[in-house]
Amino acid sequence: MGLVDLHTGLGPWGHGELISHEGANDAGYRRGTDWWGDVRSMVDGESVSAALSGDWLGALDELLPHVEITAVALEFGTVDVVSVLQALRADAVLHAHGDARGPDAPAVRAQVRAAFADDDPAWFDAVSAR
């Protein structure tokens, strides 16, 4: 089974990076490179993503033990990483200490949207081409 999990926020603007949760010596990583070409490993430090544990792609092998799974995330870059982190922080603060329907909420939602979905038609074209 092949699975592509779409993400936005990290990496160069409009570039789509295929990211494996497995290392270069793992069968799933090798199948991914056979199927899709240039796959980067978060485990080996090759990708725009930090190495994560507990991600759902990694859990698939346990959930479906009799299925050969080849899973990657496809991460499209939007804005610089500091802007992404600031948007995530603003959203977390709003939900932990603010009012999701209060006067600050629309600005925070706009900040999060700007960090994860560029409205520029050229960005959409780059994402669609990938």
Where are each of the predicted segments found?
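C-terminal accessory segments enriched in acidic
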Residues: 1-130
